[in-house]
From Swiss-Prot:
GO cellular component, as recorded: inclusion body; nucleus; perinuclear region of cytoplasm; synaptic vesicle
Lineage of the species this protein comes from: Eukaryota, Metazoa, Chordata, Craniata, Vertebrata
Keyword annotations: Acetylation, Copper, Metal-binding, Metal-thiolate cluster, Phosphoprotein, Zinc
Region (Beta): 1-30
Entry protein name: Metallothionein-3
């Protein structure tokens, strides 16, 4: 599966675990770690977040959660 897209439409339902690296998740059920760089406590993760910044997940910052 393409790591930069989500397998469901806007408002759809999907399973998004810690291994999910989609950058534009629109799933209402996807609330945690949708961005590879998004912190687990972030509640805005399902709203079109993208990872920006340096190389590697530790150097990147989530556009929604920073």
């Amino acid at each position: 599966m393409d790591p930069e897209t989500c397998p469901c439409p806007t408002g759809g339902s999907c399973t998004c675990e810690d291994s999910c690296k989609c950058q534009g998740c629109k799933c209402t059920s996807c609330k945690k770690s949708c961005c590879s760089c998004c912190p687990a406590e972030c509640e805005k993760c399902a709203k079109d977040c993208v990872c920006k910044g340096g190389e590697g997940a530790e150097a990147e910052k989530c556009s929604c959660c920073q």
